[in-house]
Amino acid sequence: MGNTILSFILIPAVAAVFVPVMAKVKTRMAESIAGLTFLAGLVNIIVPLFLVVPSDTGRIPADCMLFFTAGLIYLSCLCTTFYSASELETSRPGRSYFFSLLLLTASLLCGAAAAENFFTLYLYIEVLGLVAAAMLAVSRSGTVGLTAASDWIFITLPASVLCIAGISLLFLSMGNLSYESLKQMALSGDPFGAPVFAVTLLMTGLLLKACIFLMPQERSSDFRTDLPVSGHLVLQLARLGAMYAVFRISILIRFSFGNAAFLSSSLMFTGAVILVWSTLCALNVKDLKRMACFFDFSNAGMLFTAAGLGTPLSVLSALFIFLSSTSGTTLLLICGGLTERKKTRFQSLFYSHGSFLMLAGGLSQSGIPPFAGFWSRLLLVIALFDSGRNVYAVLAAVSSVLMLSAVLRQRRKLFTENGAEKYRNRQEIDKSACTESDRPAIKTEIENHSNPEEDFSAGYQDESSEYEPDRRKEFLLDPLYGNGEKWLKLLPAWFSFLILLCGGILFPFLYMYLHLTTGSLFL
């Protein structure tokens, strides 16, 4: 088991070294190596996840949680790889380094999940923040990427100071930083005021790293509408690592110090505030990418509430919060990226597929069946009611209704305003039936089916277009040029949709199987 977890850390790190070298031979080798690495990792995760169940029931809680987290990490990185392969131009400098850093991100996240002491956990999270800043810098050319990276480092600096202070105090009070030492101190009955305070400082810093939106919005990279979707997916991965660290530490404190009620209650209250604040903000945004970020923050609030509660049922709901946050937010971010390309061939592609995919992602984030987000909301509400936390349960239920209304309003805005309904029934031009002499007629046909301000050909007549000049001729022959590339653009969205659907439908059967096998509610 240890060798398997170690392979999840080392293989992406080794592949990250070869990506820039292979990209010099062929540009597309960068995303190919990254995609194959993540696909192989997912296969290597799925098989042991089911093989460990009947063999050793005593190791099931830790092993299943670790494999589940590693699977979500590889899933998020795989979706980011597929989308970035078509969003990042092949001529962009440093394009191969983006995929190399993405592989390194997966390695760091798996290392944080497998960490057995507080210092290693913080070290992985801190390096992950620096890698995320580097990926933001190369996600878009010019000053946009550099500004987003510098903002990210500036905002996370106070959080890093709090984490370092907490780890230093924890080392001075305990003598080491291992999880087992904290458990032994709790069982021995010694005074534990200083260790709990130190862990509180560490969790506060990680909370700031997971929810950067508490900082001023104009200085937050999460609210930069000019940042590409690849950058937002990178920030999602960085938040995922901080969210997991908070969850891991809070469960450890809850189970070790059963009478540390103040810390657990404070974490629950913080999660409830984050949930309410992000839900209300999602109702007032007009950009789909920003709405997806707010939905991700609301999932973080639910996760902190579940971690503060600390019951087996709330821990089970936290697993599906991770799944819903990872897949649902990715789905909405990709749909938001397609809406921005108003002068490219992907606009009609969005209106032919984006309506359904956006609705599916929004329903999952809102907790509507049959998607995985339904189980995360339902289990958390049941756990809160069962523990007597009725106010928190009502807030979680009301937030689902408000998030659903935000999704429906955003969908109505995108598909009914500004003549968007014209794109949904737009006919594609058969490229094989076109000749060089047909270019003027086809260009006229494109202009007739487009709004004046959204002329498809204008994006390729402009010298500042983000696409290469040698592809403008092929664009005039087919506004949806590159069938393979357009499906590559939609592949992570459909992949996330299938994960959400399968997670919601197969969960009862998987739960009954694990429950009958282990006889335990805590998976």
Task: Give residue spans per PLM region.
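N-terminal signal-anchor/start-transfer transmembrane helix
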Residues: S7-T27, L207-F213
